[in-house]
Swiss-Prot record:
GO cellular component, one term: mitochondrion
Species: Bos taurus
Molecular functions per Gene Ontology: metal ion binding
Keywords: Acetylation, Copper, Disulfide bond, Metal-binding, Mitochondrion
Domain spans labelled CHCH: 28-71
Keyword presence, Aminoacyl-tRNA synthetase: no
Upper lineage: Eukaryota, Metazoa, Chordata, Craniata, Vertebrata
Name of the protein: COX assembly mitochondrial protein homolog
Motif Cx9C motif 1 per UniProt: ranges: 31-41
C-alpha cells in the first residue's frame, strides 16, 4: 500500500508522542534562559537544589507550560511534523540523515 506523501491524517502515536516530542524540544529552545538559570542553580546548589532552586524551577515550568497549552504552538509543531513526514515519504530518507553533511572527499 503506497502512502500519499501529502496525506494529512495523523495516527495516535503521531498525535500523542511524536508531535509532543517536537513541542518539548522547541519549548526548551524558546525557554532557554529559564533552562540555563535552572541548570546553573542546580549545579551551584548540589544536594540542596530541591529547596534552593524552587524559584528557577517554577519559572521554567511556567514557561514550558505556556507553550504546551498554546494551540497555535501545537499547530506550528504539527505542521513541522507533517512537512518532515511528507519529505520522508517522498525520499525515504529520515530528516536526521538528510541533514548530515556528506563527506566531500574520500
Amino acid at each position: 500500500m503506497a502512502l500519499d506523501p501529502s496525506e494529512q491524517h495523523l495516527r495516535h502515536v503521531e498525535k500523542d508522542v511524536l508531535i509532543p516530542k517536537i513541542m518539548r524540544e522547541k519549548a526548551r529552545e524558546r525557554c532557554s534562559e529559564q533552562v540555563q538559570d535552572f541548570t546553573k542553580c542546580c549545579k551551584d546548589s548540589g544536594v540542596l537544589m530541591v529547596v534552593k532552586c524552587r524559584k528557577e524551577n517554577s519559572a521554567l515550568k511556567d514557561c514550558l507550560t505556556s507553550y504546551y497549552k498554546d494551540p497555535a504552538f501545537y499547530e506550528e509543531c504539527k505542521m513541522e511534523y507533517l512537512k518532515e513526514r511528507e519529505e520522508f515519504r517522498r525520499t525515504g530518507i529520515p530528516t536526521k540523515k538528510r541533514l548530515q553533511k556528506l563527506p566531500t572527499s574520500m
